[in-house]
Amino acid sequence: MLPLNLDSLFTPLAFAFLIMGDGSWDKSGSRIILHLNNFTLIEVNRIQSILLSKFDISSYLVKTPHSDKDRGYILKIPARNVSKVRELISDHIYPTLKYKIGL
Protein backbone atom coordinates (compact mmCIF):
# COMPACT_ATOMS: atom_id res chain seq x y z
CA MET A 1 0.00 0.00 0.00
CA LEU A 2 1.38 3.35 -1.01
CA PRO A 3 1.25 6.31 1.40
CA LEU A 4 -1.30 9.01 0.66
CA ASN A 5 1.45 11.64 0.47
CA LEU A 6 3.58 9.65 -1.99
CA ASP A 7 3.87 12.62 -4.34
CA SER A 8 5.67 14.65 -1.68
CA LEU A 9 7.87 11.69 -0.70
CA PHE A 10 8.78 10.73 -4.27
CA THR A 11 12.09 12.53 -4.69
CA PRO A 12 14.93 11.78 -7.10
CA LEU A 13 16.51 9.74 -4.29
CA ALA A 14 13.33 7.71 -3.79
CA PHE A 15 13.10 7.17 -7.56
CA ALA A 16 16.71 5.96 -7.56
CA PHE A 17 15.93 3.43 -4.82
CA LEU A 18 12.90 2.21 -6.78
CA ILE A 19 15.06 1.64 -9.85
CA MET A 20 17.87 0.01 -7.88
CA GLY A 21 15.39 -2.41 -6.32
CA ASP A 22 12.84 -3.08 -9.04
CA GLY A 23 14.42 -1.71 -12.20
CA SER A 24 16.13 -3.27 -15.17
CA TRP A 25 17.68 -2.10 -18.42
CA ASP A 26 16.20 -3.34 -21.69
CA LYS A 27 19.08 -3.26 -24.17
CA SER A 28 16.90 -4.10 -27.15
CA GLY A 29 14.63 -1.11 -26.60
CA SER A 30 17.10 1.15 -24.77
CA ARG A 31 14.51 1.66 -22.06
CA ILE A 32 14.17 1.30 -18.32
CA ILE A 33 11.69 -1.21 -16.95
CA LEU A 34 10.21 -1.06 -13.46
CA HIS A 35 8.94 -4.47 -12.34
CA LEU A 36 6.05 -3.44 -10.11
CA ASN A 37 4.46 -6.89 -10.04
CA ASN A 38 3.14 -6.67 -6.48
CA PHE A 39 1.47 -3.29 -6.94
CA THR A 40 -2.16 -2.90 -7.96
CA LEU A 41 -3.15 -1.10 -11.13
CA ILE A 42 -4.26 1.92 -9.07
CA GLU A 43 -0.86 2.07 -7.34
CA VAL A 44 1.08 1.72 -10.59
CA ASN A 45 -1.06 4.44 -12.18
CA ARG A 46 -0.20 6.68 -9.22
CA ILE A 47 3.52 6.11 -9.68
CA GLN A 48 3.16 6.74 -13.40
CA SER A 49 1.27 9.97 -12.76
CA ILE A 50 3.89 11.19 -10.26
CA LEU A 51 6.73 10.49 -12.71
CA LEU A 52 4.96 12.59 -15.32
CA SER A 53 3.82 15.47 -13.10
CA LYS A 54 6.98 15.85 -10.99
CA PHE A 55 9.72 14.93 -13.45
CA ASP A 56 8.11 15.10 -16.92
CA ILE A 57 8.97 11.43 -17.47
CA SER A 58 6.39 9.56 -19.51
CA SER A 59 5.95 5.82 -19.34
CA TYR A 60 3.55 3.08 -20.30
CA LEU A 61 2.11 0.07 -18.52
CA VAL A 62 2.24 -3.55 -19.54
CA LYS A 63 0.36 -6.37 -17.83
CA THR A 64 2.61 -9.38 -17.37
CA PRO A 65 1.29 -12.71 -18.63
CA HIS A 66 0.20 -15.33 -16.12
CA SER A 67 -0.05 -12.81 -13.29
CA ASP A 68 -2.72 -12.27 -10.67
CA LYS A 69 -5.72 -10.45 -12.14
CA ASP A 70 -5.27 -7.48 -9.77
CA ARG A 71 -1.49 -7.24 -9.93
CA GLY A 72 1.40 -7.99 -12.25
CA TYR A 73 2.28 -4.74 -13.98
CA ILE A 74 5.51 -3.39 -15.34
CA LEU A 75 6.18 0.24 -16.13
CA LYS A 76 8.34 0.96 -19.16
CA ILE A 77 10.20 4.24 -19.52
CA PRO A 78 10.92 4.68 -23.23
CA ALA A 79 14.28 5.60 -24.74
CA ARG A 80 13.25 9.23 -25.30
CA ASN A 81 13.02 9.71 -21.49
CA VAL A 82 16.09 7.76 -20.41
CA SER A 83 18.38 10.81 -20.50
CA LYS A 84 15.98 12.64 -18.13
CA VAL A 85 16.06 9.71 -15.72
CA ARG A 86 19.84 9.51 -15.84
CA GLU A 87 20.21 13.24 -15.24
CA LEU A 88 17.76 13.11 -12.35
CA ILE A 89 19.05 10.09 -10.45
CA SER A 90 22.52 9.02 -11.60
CA ASP A 91 24.19 10.73 -8.61
CA HIS A 92 22.01 8.62 -6.28
CA ILE A 93 22.61 5.23 -7.93
CA TYR A 94 25.26 2.91 -6.51
CA PRO A 95 28.04 2.51 -9.09
CA THR A 96 27.49 -1.25 -9.27
CA LEU A 97 23.81 -0.70 -10.15
CA LYS A 98 24.19 1.95 -12.86
CA TYR A 99 23.66 -0.79 -15.44
CA LYS A 100 19.95 -0.56 -14.50
CA ILE A 101 19.85 2.81 -16.26
CA GLY A 102 22.07 1.73 -19.12
CA LEU A 103 25.34 3.16 -17.80
Where are these regions (language model features)?
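Internal intein/HINT superfamily modules and their associated LAGLIDADG
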Residues: 1-103
